[in-house]
Amino acid sequence: MTEMTFDDLPQSVGHITQGAPFALGEEELDAFAKATWLDKAYLDDIPEFPETLVEGFLLLSMLDAAAKLASPASSSTMWGLNYGLDRVRFIAPVHMGQRVLSTYEILAVEPKDNGYKVLRRCTFTVEGQDRPAMVADWWSLAFPRGTVERARERS
């Protein structure tokens, strides 16, 4: 499937998308610590905590951007938003500079209002490793383009 349209969603169960590899560096780790106040909450250094270890919640926060960059979804026919997570597991460590590979598999598509709830299994794996670093089951809502605009006009 090259570009998935809104009308393609009901038949997309089982579709797998591979994202481009990415790596997180010191700049991203520092920015995340500052934005989430981890730099304030953990003032005392924990000597046994490796400085190069990527925080699990930083990986989780990458889901949306990495999925958007990997997605063949047509932004001209639909738009989506976060609906929630059913399950998240941090299985293996990720360290600064390691290349992370992302995979997204559509597990379910269910009608919801004028759109669909879409469940994707999102897997991040460090390149060269067998075990995934993180697996998250993530629900999104997808609506046909124009739905939000029409709702705003009625408000």
Predicted regions span which residues?
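Hot-dog-fold acyl-thioester-processing enzymes
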Residues: 1-82, 147-155
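HotDog/MaoC-like acyl-thioester-processing domains
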Residues: 1-10, 93-155
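Short alpha-helix capping/helix-loop boundary micro-motifs
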Residues: 85-90
